Design a protein with these regions (language model features):
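One-carbon transfer enzymes
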Residues: 8-204
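Hydrophobic alpha-helical signal peptides and transmembrane signal-/tail-anchor segments
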Residues: 1-9
Length: 204
């Protein structure tokens, strides 16, 4: 009599959450939106906030979620200190959400195609040094543009010139003020930025 015994092995699959580090300089509304979005997701989580502004409102927002906060000066950004701190968190993706300084090449080269930025216009229009926030919206209105939008792109060594990942347009009415345009852009940022980040984490 031959006895055959079959062993069934169940392999447990452990899902490793991908790590997001956010760089921000201002109020942090986009940062908070991203943090909240990934609280309900299994693909990734925000592990730290980096800022160059010691009085930025993003600091208070980060404290609500008990996240580590790294505050640094412009000079420190171009030293090895910030890169070393960033490496400590081992991020899968670095997200610039209203970060107003240009990243040094040392950071960009350490995280190729893993640093993204959101810009409040349809690049390549209204990009480059000094083109951020209300500066962009004023230029859009002054030039009587019929549409504007957001651009999410990879970061390279030049301002706003990295490969484009995603764009979304919105109509600009002749009666729109820069403040109205800013509100329209903010709505797009809140709606699309987190999901684009999720798509990037899923595809990599």
């Amino acid at each position: 009599l031959s006895l055959f015994i079959l062993f069934f092995c169940t392999n447990e699959i452990t899902l490793v959450m991908k790590k997001i580090v956010i760089f921000a300089s201002g109020s942090g509304t986009n940062a908070e939106n991203i943090i909240k979005y990934f609280e309900t997701k299994e693909i990734g989580t925000v592990v730290a906030i980096f800022t160059n502004n010691p009085i930025a409102k993003v600091i208070e927002r980060a404290k609500k979620f008990h996240l580590p906060i790294e505050i640094f000066s412009k000079a420190e950004l171009f030293e090895s200190k910030v890169l070393q701190k960033l490496n400590d968190f081992q991020p899968d993706l670095v997200v610039l959400a209203g970060f107003l300084l240009k990243l040094p090449e040392s950071i960009i080269e350490s995280y190729p195609n893993r640093i993204i930025n959101i810009h409040p216009a349809l690049l390549p229009k209204y990009g480059g040094k000094g083109m951020y926030g209300m500066n962009v919206h004023k230029a859009v209105v002054e030039n009587k543009e019929k549409e504007t939008g957001i651009t999410i792109h990879f970061v390279n060594e030049n301002y706003d010139e990295g490969n484009i990942i995603f764009q979304k347009k919105v109509t600009v009415l002749v009666t729109d003020t820069p403040e109205v345009v800013a509100e329209k852009i903010h709505e797009l940022e809140q709606k699309y930025f987190p999901s684009v980040i999720e798509d990037l984490l899923t595809s990599n």
